[in-house]
């Protein structure tokens, strides 16, 4: 491998594929580069490219490889580093490609700048991937509070998963449950709020189990209880949580703390008990529905969104119709639907009765059509009502922001400032969100 040259001004560019946890990891690694003298690249020309890969589906794998090849063709002299799930699971793929200089997975990312510098004179790609199943501690990184100030920050507080759903490759990519120390998370959030951030979204692979491995009383409830005490933090939003891990204490906090958004993302994955059993999901429909009823009774106006997989091995048309009926009954305000992806190394990949791609595609479409109508009905209830919108960014002369319920609202930008929570009267419902006007005294 020939020596890579460094321009006088060191620059780095990040390409992030996949989930919000990956986005946080990229932001944290970018912070490490900035603290070591690098500047974020302007435009499409950098000395170093870091591709944070995704492997949740085979599409994620393919996009990761395509991105490496595209960057190498366009920038033959740049250093290319890969991180993330695909790099963790299949480092040999990137070694054989010949286009990658540094390979890290989900550990030792705190040393990524050091690896990049070594790669400039290395003869072979540096493979720094370790056995993630042996890693017991959370790798603490943080987003630079001195960087670009936005309104909403995604903060990772937990890593890894111990559930081992039969369809999912992520436990093998991110390892066992690992929680961030509560004081580290609170410290980072305080710094970001001091810089002007007004909303934090707590994220993790298995967020509902946050703190269990620390054995010191830390929990998601204890963390949220500390965060509500931060004066200028206006909103706390929770990332995806498994329904079986939603504690009574956390429900009480959502019920009583105005800063905690009335929105929960509770993955259901299927509306058929036989499919849930095959997935090794730790609940059945009766339990899930009972929780939904309890939540709606205790927290009026609560928005509920979910994840759904269609075309799981053995899912019959009858099973799928059960799922559609379940969705009609629960009426989520939003559904992220995915076709099942056969991931080598997972139990479900070897199951008989794999569903064809054509059937999976058709079922995705049927769910999307159903969801479109239900989500529109949900938004319609807000027409003429006043909601609270945290102004985030200007687009074409209009400000955009989110309601408590995770609905995007567009408002005229005149007199509006970013980072302010405005009362907004909804004047129109659109295909993707709502339009409103600020209510003045």
Annotate each PLM feature.
Residues 318-324:
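Short, acidic/polar
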Residues 80-81, 89-90, 194-317, 328:
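Conserved SAM/AdoMet-binding glycine-rich loop
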Residues 266, 307, 327, 335, ...:
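Hydrophobic, well-ordered secondary-structure elements that form the walls
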Residues 350-441:
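Terminal RNA-binding accessory module
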């Amino acid at each position: 491998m020939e020596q890579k040259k460094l321009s006088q001004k060191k620059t780095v560019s990040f390409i992030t594929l996949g989930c919000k946890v990956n986005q946080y990891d990229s932001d944290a690694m970018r912070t490490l580069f900035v603290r070591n003298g690098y500047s974020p690249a302007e435009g499409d020309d950098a000395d170093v490219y870091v591709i944070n890969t995704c492997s949740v589906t085979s599409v994620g794998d393919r996009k990761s490889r395509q991105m490496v090849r595209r960057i190498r063709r366009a920038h033959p002299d740049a250093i290319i580093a890969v991180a993330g799930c695909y790099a963790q699971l299949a480092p040999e793929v990137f070694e054989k490609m010949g286009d990658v200089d540094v390979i890290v997975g989900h550990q030792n990312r705190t040393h990524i700048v050091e690896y990049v510098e070594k790669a400039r004179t290395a003869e072979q790609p540096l493979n720094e991937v370790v056995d993630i199943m042996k890693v017991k501690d959370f790798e603490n990184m943080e987003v630079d509070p001195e960087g670009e100030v936005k309104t909403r920050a995604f903060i990772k507080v937990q890593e890894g998963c111990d559930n081992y759903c039969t369809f999912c490759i992520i436990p093998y990519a991110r390892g066992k449950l690992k929680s961030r120390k509560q004081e580290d998370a609170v410290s980072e959030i305080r710094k970001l709020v001091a810089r002007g951030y007004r909303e934090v979204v707590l994220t993790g692979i298995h967020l509902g189990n946050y703190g269990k491995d620390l054995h010191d009383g830390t929990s998601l409830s204890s963390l949220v209880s500390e965060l509500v005490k931060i004066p200028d933090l206006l909103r706390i939003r929770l990332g995806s949580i498994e329904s079986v891990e939603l504690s009574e204490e956390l429900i009480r906090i959502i019920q009583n703390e105005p800063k905690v958004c009335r929105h929960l993302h509770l993955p259901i994955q299927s509306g058929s008990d036989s499919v849930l059993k095959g997935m090794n999901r730790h609940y059945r429909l009766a339990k899930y529905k009972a929780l939904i009823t309890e939540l709606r009774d205790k927290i009026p106006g609560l928005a509920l969104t979910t994840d759904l997989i269609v075309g799981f091995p053995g899912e019959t048309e009858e099973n799928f119709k059960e799922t559609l009926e379940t969705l009609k009954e629960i009426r989520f305000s939003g559904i992220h639907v995915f076709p099942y992806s056969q991931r080598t190394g997972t139990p479900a990949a070897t199951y008989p009765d794999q569903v064809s791609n054509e059937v999976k595609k058709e079922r995705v479409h049927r769910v999307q059509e159903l969801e479109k109508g239900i989500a529109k009905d949900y938004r319609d209830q807000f027409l003429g009502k006043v909601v609270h919108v945290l102004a985030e960014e200007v687009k074409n002369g209009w400000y955009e922001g989110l309601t408590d319920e995770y609905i995007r609202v567009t408002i005229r930008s005149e007199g509006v400032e970013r980072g302010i929570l405005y009362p907004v009267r909804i004047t129109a419902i659109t295909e993707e969100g709502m339009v409103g006007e600020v209510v003045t005294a």
